[in-house]
Curated annotation (Swiss-Prot):
Name assigned to this protein: Taste receptor type 2 member 1
Comment field (misc): Most taste cells may be activated by a limited number of bitter compounds; individual taste cells can discriminate among bitter stimuli.
GO cellular component, one term: plasma membrane
Native species: Gorilla gorilla gorilla (Western lowland gorilla)
Membrane topology, Cytoplasmic segments: 31-55, 103-124, 200-222, 279-299
Residue spans crossing the bilayer: 10-30, 56-76, 82-102, 125-145, 179-199, 223-243, 258-278
Length: 299
């Protein structure tokens, strides 16, 4: 018999899972239909579609972990499962990073030759960013496969340990390398890009307020809306990364509140940010409304 708080947690996990599948599925379907109609896909749509596919698989794994936690199902821990998990997790992180870079290059206004070069070529660089991410993540997986006996399973064992003590192993150098390669590099790139974008949008908003103070101008709220969207992206991305670091370095009892809270927050990012992307994209928002209206009519 499940305890009441576990039942509530599982219901929240199911809602989170369905929301993540729906929001990311909308992105994939809408962009897929556009690809079939026009025989081509815009760079941003390509990046969003790849990110949405990776998040669907990530959401599936998070829900699988929730089922394991709630119902005490035995987790089959083998090299293949660990490699797939690592690949999906790292690829999603890098694609989200490149999305932040893309927004920064397209929207931010920075007077620097390197930034001007990036702004002019970012659309052409998107396929190479995706390909580079695939190759980089594959190299990380190959590195982990050489240490499959203790490295990747060691990461997963932290999810299912009965103690709360910090892990201490003779693999400190490998752990530091893994942290830098898997978390620090994409996080630093993302932070630089998003902070530049936030400062640029903030400066633009102040200029608009000074220029048109006391008057109503169409589109005046657009920079503020974009700024709030980017800030929410930053908060979700950063909290997602930090919680992954905590789960990688500490042991938790699987049914304690802090562990359940961490797993729930990890799942909020791939579903919550995709919802923000849909609400901020007129094409995706319109198609999502059409889908919901069609679903109501069919009932």
């Amino acid at each position: 018999m499940l305890e009441s708080h576990l039942i509530i947690y599982f219901l929240l996990a199911v809602i989170q899972f369905l929301l993540g599948i729906f929001t990311n599925g909308i992105i994939v379907v809408v962009n897929g239909i556009d690809l079939i109609k026009h025989r081509k896909m815009a760079p941003l749509d390509l990046l969003l579609s790849c990110l949405a596919v990776s998040r669907i698989f990530l959401q599936l794994f998070i829900f699988y972990v929730n089922v394991i936690v709630i119902f005490f199902i035995e987790f089959i821990m083998c090299s293949a499962n660990c490699a797939i998990l690592l690949f999906i997790n790292e690829l999603e992180l890098w694609l989200a990073t490149w999305l932040g870079v893309f927004y920064c290059a397209k929207v931010a206004s920075v007077r620097h030759p390197l930034f001007x070069w990036l702004k002019m070529r970012i659309s052409k660089l998107v396929p190479w960013m995706i390909l580079g991410s695939l190759l980089y993540v594959s190299m990380i997986c190959v590195f982990h496969s050489k240490y499959a006996g203790f490295m990747v399973p060691y990461f997963l064992r932290n999810f299912f340990s009965q103690n709360t003590t910090i892990q201490k192993e003779d693999t400190l150098a490998i752990q530091i390398f893994s942290f830098v390669a898997e978390f620090s590099v994409p996080l630093l790139i993302f932070l630089v890009a998003v902070l530049l974008l936030i400062f640029s949008l903030g400066r633009h908003t102040r200029q608009m307020r000074n220029t048109v103070a006391g008057s109503r101008v169409p589109g005046r709220g657009a920079p503020i809306s974009a700024l709030l969207s980017i800030l929410s992206f930053l908060i979700l991305y950063f909290s997602h990364c930090m919680i992954k670091v905590f789960l990688s370095s500490l042991k938790f009892h699987i049914r304690r509140f802090i562990f359940l809270f961490f797993i729930l927050v990890i799942g909020i990012y791939p579903s919550g940010h995709s919802l923000i992307l849909i609400l901020g994209n007129p094409k995706l928002k319109q198609n999502a409304k059409k889908f919901l209206l069609h679903s109501k009519c069919c009932q």
